[in-house]
């Protein structure tokens, strides 16, 4: 049995956050090819949703060498569209952030949120990170050099909050503030900014 993150979710949701610990990313097709190349056949697979989408596969070793052909057209189309939409996504996110005349904080200083800020290059619009982990507080995020605050050090009620936590933890943070401007930057989430949701819907049925 194997369980790996399903990168199809990144393609589908234009999620440009990455875990630097993950050397390889898979979807069902590429995982199947890796297994076939090592003479394993998938006998069952399913997906689950927790902090993102994951693929679970059950595979068995074949006694005889398996024959297979590689067809990567579907993956190629997904990758090209994901790449093509990057600049559009970046510009729309910058436009979205520029409209606010308040401090903007990313709540949750984890690997995905830090990499998202750095890879998209939006550090200049962000006032800092907020995190409840005391070991992170009053330190600085590599590259963006943004300070990490505790929730008591900033006025969250009068700020824009970008949720950089897993969807299942969002409500716990929302209860801490009366801010009217709370958005997620980590799919899957119902709190993504509208421009992001529109981008997802417009590209949902592209082949």
Task: Name these PLM-found stretches.
Residues 34-35, 177:
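Hydrophobic C-terminal alpha-helix "anchor/cap" residues
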Residues 2-24, 28-32:
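Short, glycine-/aromatic-enriched active-site segment of Class I SAM-dependent methyltransferases
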Residues 56-207:
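Hydrophobic, well-ordered beta-alpha structural blocks that scaffold small-molecule cofactor pockets
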Residues 24, 38, 53-57, 102:
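Structural beta-strand/beta-sheet cores of well-ordered domains, especially the beta-sheet scaffolds
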Residues 8, 35, 44-45, 60:
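Long hydrophobic segments that form regular secondary structure
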Residues 14, 19, 24, 44, ...:
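Extended interfacial segments that mediate partner engagement and assembly in macromolecular machines
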Residues 40-51:
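Conserved S-adenosyl-L-methionine
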Residues 2-5, 45, 107:
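Generic beta-strand/beta-sheet core signal
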